UniProtKB/Swiss-Prot annotation:
NCBIfam families assigned to the protein according to its UniProt record, in alphabetical order: EIIBC-GUT (TIGR00825)
Its membrane topology: Multi-pass membrane protein
The protein's name: PTS system glucitol/sorbitol-specific EIIB component
GO MF annotations in UniProt: kinase activity; protein-N(PI)-phosphohistidine-sugar phosphotransferase activity; protein-phosphocysteine-sugar phosphotransferase activity
GO-annotated cellular components: plasma membrane
Residue span(s) of domain PTS EIIB type-5: 3-195
Superkingdom classification of source: Bacteria
Cited InterPro entries: PTS_EIIBC_GUT_C, PTS_EIIBC_GUT_N, PTS_sorb_EIIBC
Pfam family, any one: EIIBC-GUT_C
Reported function: The phosphoenolpyruvate-dependent sugar phosphotransferase system (sugar PTS), a major carbohydrate active transport system, catalyzes the phosphorylation of incoming sugar substrates concomitantly with their translocation across the cell membrane. The enzyme II complex composed of SrlA, SrlB and SrlE is involved in glucitol/sorbitol transport.
GO biological process, one term: phosphoenolpyruvate-dependent sugar phosphotransferase system
Domain notes: The EIIB domain is phosphorylated by phospho-EIIA on a cysteinyl or histidyl residue, depending on the transported sugar. Then, it transfers the phosphoryl group to the sugar substrate concomitantly with the sugar uptake processed by the EIIC domain.
Length: 336
């Protein structure tokens, strides 16, 4: 009887990507989950039972990439969505998010699947071929003077002594290509990230104003957001280590509360000068869910991750109230 079994993962309602067929193997049998607050998603236990792999909480320790056969995230569409697909590690997102974030180009259907729940995971057929991230061995290549993937000017510049004219031409070409690619990336980021966010905020403001929720919430919010002391209390709540990692994913909480505060400032309920300390108060928890991923990108040792995650969480807790107080002092006299 085989030690490990292959599973098939399909996208859920509103999801993207897949289906993925994955199977652990000796030395590459770790299921890494990096979800808000280090909470274990319900699908982890099912995957472990079906495959025979071992699960590791990315908030508590790190795992060498060569030992990871599958990653589970709960990203709402930011950088974390594309980090592991970029490394060609099969990725499950429990949120219904598609090609989104600055690494969207790496999020493809053959390595990523989203909106995954218990019903989307099952044992794979014996004939199914699991994903294998193997490097293609390099074969000896015959040398040619010209190449189909390079311009004549590039080939001449590489294969012969470049003249001043060639150097100037190549330099100008690189500058133009760099600017052109920067423009393409900027437009792509606008389409995939900024415009959807603007639409989300517009919809949220419409719901708040149309439903009357804003008036009800304003009565609760004004005692906190309407003065500096209240904002420091709000910053204290958002910086509590047990809550900050849960409030961080996708910055959804900060977006909603920020929109509500912005609407109330526009209506005159909250003084405009409190916009600055309010910004610091509602963003104290930002990126607290990203700490293990960031340490992993820096190739931190497991011991470093174990110490680094609580260190950052507690450092945010210690500076949560002081940063709001400094912003409150700096906002005195604004818009007057």
């Amino acid at each position: 009887m085989e030690k490990y079994n292959a599973i098939k993962i399909v996208k859920g309602s509103g999801g993207f990507g897949g289906p993925l067929t994955v199977k652990p193997e000796e030395g590459k049998d770790t299921l890494l989950y990096i979800t808000g607050g280090g909470a274990e998603p319900e699908i982890v236990e099912k995957i472990v039972n079906l495959t025979g792999c071992k699960a590791v909480n990315g908030f508590k320790t790190s795992v060498p990439e060569e030992q990871i056969f599958l990653v589970i995230i709960d990203c709402g569409g930011t950088l974390r969505c594309g980090i592991y697909p970029q490394k060609r590690i099969p990725t499950i997102n429990v949120m219904p998010v598609g090609k989104s974030g600055p690494l969207a180009k790496f999020i493809t259907e053959d390595i990523y699947v989203s909106a995954v729940g218990l019903n989307q995971i099952s044992l794979a057929d014996s004939s199914a071929e699991p994903i294998k991230s193997t490097k293609v061995p390099e074969e000896g290549k015959r040398e040619f003077k010209y190449s189909a993937d390079k311009k004549v000017s590039q080939s001449l510049a590489e294969n012969s002594k470049s003249s001043i004219v060639q150097k100037i031409g190549m330099g100008a070409g690189k500058v133009v290509n760099t600017l052109y690619q920067a423009g393409r990336d900027a437009v792509q980021s606008m389409i995939t990230t900024i415009l959807p966010f603007m639409a989300f905020v517009a919809m949220l403001i419409g719901i708040i104003q149309g439903s009357g929720f804003g008036n009800w919430f304003a009565k609760i919010l004004v005692p906190l957001a309407g003065n500096g002391i209240g904002l420091m209390i709000l910053g204290f709540i958002c910086s509590i280590p047990l809550l900050s990692a849960l409030l961080g994913p996708g910055a959804v909480i900060a977006q909603i509360v920020g929109t509500l505060i912005g609407v109330e400032i526009g209506k005159g309920t909250i003084p405009p000068s409190l916009a600055l300390p309010a910004l610091f108060a509602i963003n104290t928890q930002c990126a607290c869910d990203f700490i293990p991923v960031g340490l992993g990108l820096a190739e931190a040792e497991p011991e470093t991750v174990e110490v680094g995650v609580p260190s950052v969480l507690y450092s945010r807790f210690m500076i949560g109230v002081p940063r709001v107080a400094v912003a409150w002092v700096a906002s005195i006299g604004l818009y007057q």
